[in-house]
Amino acid sequence: MAAKDVKFGRTAREKMLRGVDILADAVKVTLGPKGRNVVIEKSFGAPRITKDGVSVAKEVELEDKFENMGAQMLREVASKTNDTAGDGTTTATVLGQAIVQEGAKAVAAGMNPMDLKRGIDLAVNEVVAELLKKAKKINTSEEVAQVGTISANGEAEIGKMIAEAMQKVGNEGVITVEEAKTAETELEVVEGMQFDRGYLSPYFVTNPEKMVADLEDAYILLHEKKLSNLQALLPVLEAVVQTSKPLLIIAEDVEGEALATLVVNKLRGGLKIAAVKAPGFGDRRKAMLEDIAILTGGQVISEDLGIKLESVTLDMLGRAKKVSISKENTTIVDGAGQKAEIDARVGQIKQQIEETTSDYDREKLQERLAKLAGGVAVIRVGGATEVEVKEKKDRVDDALNATRAAVEEGIVAGGGTALLRASTKITAKGVNADQEAGINIVRRAIQAPARQITTNAGEEASVIVGKILENTSETFGYNTANGEYGDLISLGIVDPVKVVRTALQNAASVAGLLITTEAMIAELPKKDAAPAGMPGGMGGMGGMDF
């Protein structure tokens, strides 16, 4: 085991504080509408330019191990906030730094760190309750667009696009952000359920121009095993032919004789049909087939349930108004499933999302949820250069997360104003002077985001904060973008409560740990061994002529 370097008390805290300051100073320049960019060197390719706090925080790695520990703990504030709320990482970092700085001063003055932490926790709980009480619910598409615009650093086009996407796929719907191949940013909405499996044979195509198979008012047969022989299916195929409706077969695979028979029947015009492979693998495939069955009002034909192919009747098949199948994707629009059953399935998947510990499983469950709940929207971010596209994509991701958070818990006045107002409403009382000091630390620290936003805009923070607090209106504040005072909610300068709340709770949690740290242990750097001496020259080489 390698030797360790141990630092105690004030020396440890000073080192840690230096690390916190380096990381926070790099992150906080990005805060607000007039925040600056940070350029990050990449080991290959062009440098990355970003205004995303968590992206900056993740790049900071310091040489001094003790300073690095402080920086990494503050980085945890940004990462945790990003995981929970998806935005507010810079605000969280600024709050974390402010609480640590104030706390370190109090500890240096001889106060008890544990009591300080208790005081900080008391005040934070009160501020969170105040924020939730003041939250205004979001109802209109315009309000959704405002939240998106603020988080995308004032880019109204992005805000509008997110609002439109949410309107089309619902708040539960999946909205993904991708890099576009063009300079334009565009929105594409896929209604209904789409999965990434295309037709098994190009002979199923009904529209040769677009190379897609469109089935109107179709029956859907869902089978969890391979189909290599159609003998067992003949009764149901004949029943479908009688109705003159098209049929889509979704099975693990359709191969050999079965596929050939379907293609021949399709070409002869006797049967409007298409076949695709079932989406997913293993247990996930079973679950997705069950989802499609519920969405279309059909049944999965499964040996496990004791249903044999020979006994399948028309009422076991799903129905959909339209099915569109391309080379890569199948989209089922307007399935005939019962709303109550779909809602029950959605509830079941939500429960699984809450219980799962795997990020991958959670992502897959959310995809399934979206497909059932209404569709998928894709925002393709365009730009003139790759660097610009990456920077813009960061902002769109933040804006999307902020918008979701706003729909969930509501909004408050933006620009750090909600926390500024809350600082005057803290009434908590500590049981001793040190706890009181902890409460006062939060009073001062939660003014930091508003001060930083105005400082980044080149304004005098104390003057502006003073003027905002003189006015008693909850929503009165300063619009840094144009340098005017006014009602922030009606100006559309708003923050999601969830983002502000999460930022404060995470900042206070990690800052409390940093303040109460008394010893730090790091591995000593290994001393390089002296290089071995050069071997002696070969004997008898002297006096040779070259």
From Swiss-Prot:
* CDD domains, per database record: GroEL (cd03344)
InterPro entries (UniProt xref): Chaperonin_Cpn60_CS, Cpn60/GroEL, Cpn60/GroEL/TCP-1, GroEL-like_apical_dom_sf, GROEL-like_equatorial_sf, TCP-1-like_intermed_sf
Binding locations of ATP: 30-33, 51, 87-91, 415, 495
Query: What does the record say about induction?
Result: By heat shock.
- Sorted UniProt keywords: ATP-binding, Chaperone, Cytoplasm, Isomerase, Nucleotide-binding
* Localisation: Cytoplasm
Extract one GO cellular component term from the record: cytoplasm
MF terms (GO), sorted A to Z: ATP binding; ATP-dependent protein folding chaperone; isomerase activity; unfolded protein binding
- Known EC number(s)? 5.6.1.7
Please name the GO terms of the biological process aspect recorded for this protein, alphabetically. Answer: protein refolding
Any Pfam family the entry gives: Cpn60_TCP1
- Catalyzed chemical reaction(s): ATP + H2O + a folded polypeptide = ADP + phosphate + an unfolded polypeptide
Q: How does the annotation summarize its subunit structure?
A: Forms a cylinder of 14 subunits composed of two heptameric rings stacked back-to-back. Interacts with the co-chaperonin GroES.
Q: Which family does it belong to?
A: Belongs to the chaperonin (HSP60) family.
What function does this protein fulfil?
Together with its co-chaperonin GroES, plays an essential role in assisting protein folding. The GroEL-GroES system forms a nano-cage that allows encapsulation of the non-native substrate proteins and provides a physical environment optimized to promote and accelerate protein folding.
Its recorded name reads Chaperonin GroEL
Species this chain originates from: Brucella abortus (strain S19)
